[in-house]
UniProtKB/Swiss-Prot annotation:
PANTHER family: ANTITERMINATION NUSB DOMAIN-CONTAINING PROTEIN, N UTILIZATION SUBSTANCE PROTEIN B-RELATED. The keyword Transcription regulation applies. InterPro entries: NusB-like_sf, NusB_fam, NusB_RsmB_TIM44. One of its GO terms (cellular component) is cytosol. HAMAP family: NusB. Involved in transcription antitermination. Required for transcription of ribosomal RNA (rRNA) genes. Binds specifically to the boxA antiterminator sequence of the ribosomal RNA (rrn) operons. The keyword RNA-binding applies. Belongs to the NusB family. This is Transcription antitermination protein NusB. One of its GO terms (molecular function) is RNA binding. One of its GO terms (biological process) is DNA-templated transcription termination. SUPFAM superfamilies: NusB-like. Keywords: RNA-binding, Transcription, Transcription antitermination, Transcription regulation.
Length: 150
């Protein structure tokens, strides 16, 4: 099996999204992270315990630990008549992941985190959702400059 992931930060963000999505479906955090990271890296006899990259674990653990706060922030930026429950699980997960990195990862410039999550959104959602995610996260970045690193 060929590995289509190269362990770049973008690839690890995508794997974090996959793990977070699986957690929402009932998977355990570490098991979901290990599966998302290693499902295409090892097969059969080559199977081994892979060391998870800190960046991946930090994203998955951080989003999981701050989920309520992230959901509240997302809710405050939704248009009137919209609620968090109305969003698809894919969009909610992407918003949580992008917002977490923007808010808590000082080493990642806000615009980089924003652009990266949009690229993941384009792969796992449709163009309308990618634009929606871009708009909501851009609004957050522009409204809270003192709380962000831009």
């Amino acid at each position: 099996m060929t590995n289509s992931f190269q362990n770049s930060r973008r690839d690890l963000r995508e794997r974090a999204f996959q793990a977070l999505f699986n957690i929402e479906m009932g998977a355990e955090l570490l098991a979901a992270s290990q599966f998302a990271y290693g499902y295409d890296k090892v097969t059969g006899e080559d199977a081994q315990v892979l060391e998870l990259p800190i960046f991946l674990l930090s994203l998955v653990t951080g989003v999981n630990n701050h989920k309520e706060e992230l959901d509240n922030l997302i809710s405050t930026h939704l248009k009137k008549g919209w609620s968090l429950e109305r969003l698809t699980l894919t969009d909610k997960t992407l918003l949580r992941l992008g917002l977490f990195e923007i808010k808590y990862f000082d080493e990642t410039p806000d615009r980089v985190a924003l652009n990266e999550i949009i690229e993941v959104a384009k792969k796992y959602s449709d163009e309308t959702s990618a634009k929606f995610i871009n708009g909501l996260l851009s609004q957050y970045v522009s409204e809270a400059p003192s709380a962000n690193k831009s």
